[in-house]
Regions:
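A short, basic N-terminal segment
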Residues: 1-36, 189
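The catalytic "switch" region of P-loop NTPases
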Residues: 9, 151-244, 251-252, 266, ...
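P-loop NTPase nucleotide-binding core
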Residues: 30, 34-46, 50-161, 179, ...
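Winged-helix-like regulatory helical subdomains adjacent to P-loop NTPase cores
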Residues: 221-337, 343-344, 372-381
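Acidic-basic catalytic patches of nuclease active cores, encompassing PD-(D/E)XK
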Residues: 394-437
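Conserved catalytic cores of phosphodiester-cleaving nucleases, focusing on short active-site segments
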Residues: 422, 450-452, 456-467, 482
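Active-site metal-binding core of divalent-cation-utilizing nuclease and nuclease-like domains
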Residues: 425-456
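Nucleic-acid nuclease catalytic cores
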Residues: 472-476, 483-512
Length: 521
């Protein structure tokens, strides 16, 4: 059976096309070799479980590795201390029973089996004693990996368990204990504590303050994506510009593992194996239209955390910037969920896919009540001529509707909402056929660059808040430079002008060898 791209559950090298993560495994092994206890807390569908499965094999030559998971455990397992401790022992024995523990000694098997059969595990103290016996009798150093620790996040008994492991860690020079402990989940232990005790005084008091930093970048690089595509190309003998495809996929995903694999899967299965920039764009268009657990989680989290939602909205529609400060709750929680990241000391949306999905989500909340959206819906058929989008006419019509609908509003309203209103007008025009995205690197409070991809043709529209002639001149220069980057000869400038003597309308500007069509509203 030929290999497939996989986005559901664990990936296996003999069944699925995978990025080679040996370099990441080597970095994690360094932490294990150093006897570190640490947490792999990364966003949903970030390849944590697949990485841990491969890590067990990577460590097998030197360590006895117990890899257990809290996934699927019912509430009964956490009801009492005795029940929880018994469950831990049973999970360890299950791993042995199914030959999942490398370098396991018969003495260790006997200790765990006897503890279960004779009901020796009654509380944390007896569990601690059994764990010490396991580590004492194992020939190889013992590593404990626990996946899906979020499942235990609402239970105090799990925090007590962490406290017990911490106590053993602090006494490791005199008492046998685990060589290394790895916990994996979305939440870090500080936030687990917060979920159990809402008291602000206690939310920072983590029982896991022994944990080392986990500096491993688990996102995929262009080179890693390229390696995976080379394997696919070798097996399928298709015509593929591998480097170009890898770079384009990375530009959309910033290496987010699920999104990388999903785009590849869509190209392979639903885009006719069209391994080109256009094929990637087609896959992205499908991806942005579908529901999946990752996008469902994105929507749920910004509903649950209004501070995060407000920050994302301000970044996207008002071009506001936020210095990256992990002590800020919204920034901390947004980073933990993988929606934002730090770049050059500033908060940025984690990737172009999330950014466009958020734009679509926020805009969709206004569609039924937005007059400008309804205007775009009515106008849309007149903009397509011989399969080509007439962007000049789109901007001209938007200018007319904008003055008719919003002409009497204040400058503050226009400055804060102009860009959002243009996106609302544009959305029904390209919906179902084209894509758009915002260039995050150039977005600020006065400028937003929109790139529209419609049937293989790209259009660059720069939206400017205009205060003064000199500022507009710089806008023309910036747009011309951007057109050069995209190898385009024509670009569009939509200016929201706040000068008293402004002249509204459409004009064409020749800037070097570039043609700029400017609409002033």
């Amino acid at each position: 059976m030929s290999r497939k791209f996989n986005v559901n559950g664990v990936c296996y090298p003999d069944e699925h096309y995978m990025v080679n993560i040996d370099s990441k495994l080597a970095e994690i092994k360094e932490l294990v070799d150093e006897k570190q206890y640490f947490v792999i807390n990364r966003a949903r569908q970030y390849g944590k479980t697949t990485t841990l499965n491969l890590l067990v094999k990577y460590l097998a030559d030197q360590y006895t590795v117990f890899f257990i998971s809290f996934e699927g455990l019912g509430g009964t397992a956490f009801e009492t201390e005795a029940e929880f401790c018994k469950t831990i022992c049973e999970l360890l024995y299950d791993a042995i029973r199914y030959d999942e523990v490398p370098q396991i000694d018969e003495a260790v098997k006997a200790i765990i089996k006897e503890s279960i059969e004779q009901n020796k595990i009654e509380d944390m103290m007896s569990l601690s004693a059994t764990l010490s016996e396991i580590c004492k009798n194992s020939v190889a150093p013992v590593v404990l990996i626990i996946d899906e620790v979020d499942q235990a996040s609402n239970y105090k008994v799990f925090i007590d368990f962490l406290g017990m492991l911490r106590s053993k860690f602090l006494k490791r020079n005199t008492r046998p204990t685990f060589h290394s402990v790895i916990l994996a989940g979305v939440y870090d232990i500080k936030n687990l504590k917060h979920r159990i005790r809402e008291d602000r005084e206690h939310q920072m008091n983590s029982p896991w303050n022994i944990a080392a930093d986990f500096p491993v970048d688990m996102s995929f690089t262009v080179e890693e994506i390229e390696g995976m595509l080379n394997e696919y190309n070798d097996e399928h003998s298709c015509v593929m510009l591998v480097r170009e495809c890898a770079k384009t996929i990375f530009e959309y995903t910033s290496g987010y593992p699920y999104l990388v694999s999903k785009i590849c899967k869509l190209i392979d299965e639903r885009c006719g194996e069209n391994w080109t920039k256009q094929g990637v764009s087609d896959a992205v268009k499908i991806l942005l239209r579908e529901a999946n657990p990752l996008f469902d989680d994105l929507r749920k989290k910004i509903t649950d955390y209004p501070e995060l939602r407000a920050m994302l909205y301000a970044i996207l529609f008002r071009g506001e910037s936020y210095p990256y400060n992990p002590d800020n709750f919204a920034i901390d929680i947004g980073t933990m969920f993988g929606f934002i990241k730090e770049k050059n000391g500033q908060v940025v949306i984690a990737n172009r896919i999330f950014e466009t999905r958020l734009y679509n989500l926020f805009l969709s909340e206004e569609l039924t009540s937005s007059i400008i959206y309804q205007s775009g819906e009515r106008d849309k058929n007149q903009f397509i001529k011989n399969g080509v989008l007439d962007m000049e006419l789109v901007l001209e019509k938007f200018m007319i509707h904008f003055h008719d609908i919003y002409g009497d509003n204040t400058n503050t309203f226009i400055e804060e909402n102009g860009r959002r209103l243009f996106l609302l007008y544009l959305k029904p025009i390209i919906n179902g056929t084209g894509n758009y995205y915002i260039e995050a690197q150039t977005r600020d409070q006065t400028r937003t660059d929109i790139i529209v991809d419609y049937l293989g043709k790209q259009y660059v529209i720069e939206l400017k808040i205009w205060h003064g002639n000199e500022y507009n001149k710089r806008g023309e220069e910036q747009l011309a430079e951007y057109l050069e980057y995209y190898h385009l000869d024509k670009g569009y400038l939509l200016s929201f002008n706040f000068n008293k003597n402004k002249q509204t309308g459409l004009k064409e500007i020749q800037f070097g060898d570039k043609t700029l069509v400017e609409v002033v509203v």
